[in-house]
Amino acid sequence: MKKILAVMATIMISLTAFADRQHVIAYTELPAQAQTSVQKHSNVADVAYVEQERDGIHPEYKVYLKNATEIDFDHRGNLQSIDCQVSPVPSGIIPELITNFVALHHPNHFIVEYTIEYRHLQVELSNGLELIFDMEGHFIRVDD
């Protein structure tokens, strides 16, 4: 019986700790650079809500727009990814070399997701195809 209570207590503590890692914040609590990015590419009135997540030392931010777009920022407000679900990622966010490549090689599709990884950039097209580029925007490969 003591073991069961100990396990239950551990589970409750774990759930409580996890709950504190993610919470809704005011738009004005975003880093200034993230606010500028949102204002540049959409209307602040389109923001549904903002979440702050804390997985490690630094928080990360997720901005959810009313049209189901999700924009992720690091603790400094640098863009990490934008997922527009089924609509095109706004122009000006993605490097021109990548948008030109997609227009030339995939003219019937558009970019719905853009992610900045540690050593590469990744885009997902409206047909589900994922393309990998180097940090300068040169095509590397199709992701499996």
Protein language model regions, located:
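Interaction-mediating elements
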Residues: 20-144
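Bacterial Sec-dependent N-terminal signal peptides
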Residues: 1-25, 38
